[in-house]
């Protein structure tokens, strides 16, 4: 098998997906009234809600009465020291963000729409407080701009979670909602993150603490140390994969038995991805293609065994890094360890996938060998009181009475497509219950379907190769991959769909919808498509 070299180092998306757009200066305390300035026919107002969360409002001179309330994604609640890949140099910020990016904000203002967004009073997992902040912010906006007639809400990642919760809990405030690349309920999400982090610890570096962090400064140091160790493992695997993709060596920090080390380390990483429910397509690896010019047997081996391992490498790196930060954050809030896999059967977790990915897992014997390590390794045990406290945090019922538009990439490695699918399934159950109740009451008209589900699919093949035949990770991430990896055209299509829903009381449908999606590019409406469930919900 030919040896391959990456054109450049592994691309990480986590930091860029989490850090937010800087739009305005940040108020330091709650202000009774917004402070406004007008320039270039746009009035910009800043202030802070009663919880001290800073906000920004922008309204054009030709304001048409509709405002877009945007909720930003997860921002770490602690600073990250410089030098740590992906997040290094991050400082905690509550800068308000009234839209996905400056281009989208400008386009909405040009169309006569207002935009508003909060920086929130607390960073990290802040859904409960953010919901209250946004409700107050809507009232402030309406008081300041009395011509407001409709409010639509949208957001990404954790902001998508917040958006869905607003639609469920406050349908009286909003005309339509669009949760994008949404996070799911926290327990399923932390199960995925915990499985990924525990898998890396178990196979590659048992000194990773992986949770149950100490209180105070000691716990912060442990979490930052884990980040360093995770990226050290990823760097070691990356070098090994590039040097010998067929049988890459194990990291020096691994303590698995020598007999297990006879199995390629790439197979262990693939197993980590599968057992956590992390996608097997990544920003640059489609899990199906091979470099041009390889002999047929080598090409088949690359397609079935090597490409999937590179995909797992990119995706697990992003999932595990966020897992460290989110675990530390949630443990601080809940008062103890929240991840528990004492009863998890990882063999059952991959019962279906192990055959589809047999070559990547080094066959039946390789799979069984790796699973034996998981079965014999010490498990993580949660603090019951902390788990109950975490369960009390905001969650989704799936019950919405206003038009709602869902959109996510099918190979998002952070908020996997299963996050969106869980809300789709909950709404389907709710709608069926409503229809059954209506029929029992003698009604013949079906309830309105208030949920429009859209998917950002990946191309069939998209891995690029250099002239030397090496995988090229310098090209942009493929559509449908990475975290919240959307184009301006896609954002504007969602914005247009929200405006239509707000004006008409229902989602766009039929030919008009399909034309809108086609023009935006890489947006799919397919009622027959169902994303894999998150592992928390079973296979």
Question: Locations of the language-model features?
Answer:
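Initiator methionine at the very start of the polypeptide chain
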Residues: 1, 31-32
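A general, composition-driven signal for non-globular sequence regions
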Residues: 1-2, 21, 402
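Bacterial N-terminal signal peptides that target proteins for export
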Residues: 2-14
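Targeting/processing segments of secretory and organellar proteins
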Residues: 7, 30-31
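Preference for short coil/turn "hinge" residues that link or interrupt alpha-helices
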Residues: 12, 16-19, 393, 408
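C-terminal segment of classical bacterial N-terminal signal peptides
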Residues: 19-29
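C-terminal His-loop and adjacent cap/lid subdomain of alpha/beta-hydrolase
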Residues: 33-153, 161-539
């Amino acid at each position: 098998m030919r040896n391959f070299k990456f054109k450049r180092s592994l691309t990480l998306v986590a930091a860029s997906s989490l850090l937010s757009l800087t739009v305005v200066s940040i108020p330091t305390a709650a202000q009774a009234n917004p402070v406004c300035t007008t320039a270039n026919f746009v009035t910009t107002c800043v202030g802070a809600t009663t919880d001290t969360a800073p906000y920004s409002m922008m309204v054009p001179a030709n304001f048409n009465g509709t405002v877009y309330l945007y909720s930003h994604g997860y921002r770490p609640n602690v600073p990250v020291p410089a030098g740590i890949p992906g997040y290094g140099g991050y400082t905690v910020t509550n800068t308000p963000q009234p839209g996905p990016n400056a281009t989208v904000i400008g386009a909405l203002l040009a169309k006569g729409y207002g935009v508003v967004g909060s920086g929130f009073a607390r960073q990290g997992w802040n859904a409960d407080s953010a919901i209250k902040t946004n409700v107050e912010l809507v009232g402030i906006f309406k008081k300041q701009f009395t011509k407001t007639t409709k409010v639509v809400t949208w957001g990404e990642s954790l902001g998508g979670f917040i958006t869905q919760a607003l639609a469920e809990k406050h349908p009286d405030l909003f005309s339509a909602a669009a949760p994008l690349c949404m996070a799911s309920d926290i327990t399923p999400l932390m199960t995925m993150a915990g499985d990924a982090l525990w898998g890396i610890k178990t196979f590659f570096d048992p000194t990773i603490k992986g949770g149950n962090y100490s209180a105070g400064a000691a716990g912060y140091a442990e979490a930052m140390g884990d980040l360093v160790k995770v990226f050290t493992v990823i760097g070691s695997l990356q070098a090994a994969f590039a040097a010998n993709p067929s049988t890459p060596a194990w990291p020096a920090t691994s303590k698995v038995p020598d007999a297990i080390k006879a199995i390629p380390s790439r197979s262990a990483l693939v197993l980590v991805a599968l057992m956590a429910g992390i996608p097997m397509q990544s920003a640059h690896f489609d899990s199906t293609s091979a470099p041009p010019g390889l002999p047929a047997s080598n090409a088949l081996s690359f397609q079935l065994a090597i490409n999937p391992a590179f995909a797992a490498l990119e995706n697990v790196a992003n999932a595990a890094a966020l897992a460290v930060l989110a675990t530390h954050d949630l443990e601080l809030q809940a008062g103890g360890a929240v991840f528990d896999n004492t009863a998890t059967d990882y063999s059952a977790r991959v019962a279906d996938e192990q055959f589809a990915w047999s070559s990547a897992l080094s066959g039946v014997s390789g799979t069984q060998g790796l699973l034996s390590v998981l079965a014999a390794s010490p498990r993580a045990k949660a603090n019951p009181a902390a788990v109950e406290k975490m369960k009390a945090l905001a969650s989704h019922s799936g019950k919405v009475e206003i038009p709602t538009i869902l959109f996510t990439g099918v190979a998002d490695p952070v908020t996997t497509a299963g996050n969106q699918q869980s809300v789709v399934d909950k709404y389907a159950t709710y709608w069926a219950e409503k229809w059954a109740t209506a029929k029992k009451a003698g009604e013949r008209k079906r309830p309105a379907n208030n949920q429009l589900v859209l998917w950002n699919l990946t191309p069939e093949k998209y891995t690029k190769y250099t002239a030397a035949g090496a995988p090229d990770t310098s090209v942009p991430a493929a559509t449908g991959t990475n975290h919240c990896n959307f184009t301006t055209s896609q954002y504007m299509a969602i914005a247009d769909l929200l405006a239509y829903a707000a004006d008409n009381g229902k989602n766009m449908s039929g030919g008009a919808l399909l034309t809108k999606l086609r023009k935006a590019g890489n947006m799919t409406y397919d009622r027959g498509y169902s994303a894999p469930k998150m592992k928390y919900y079973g296979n």
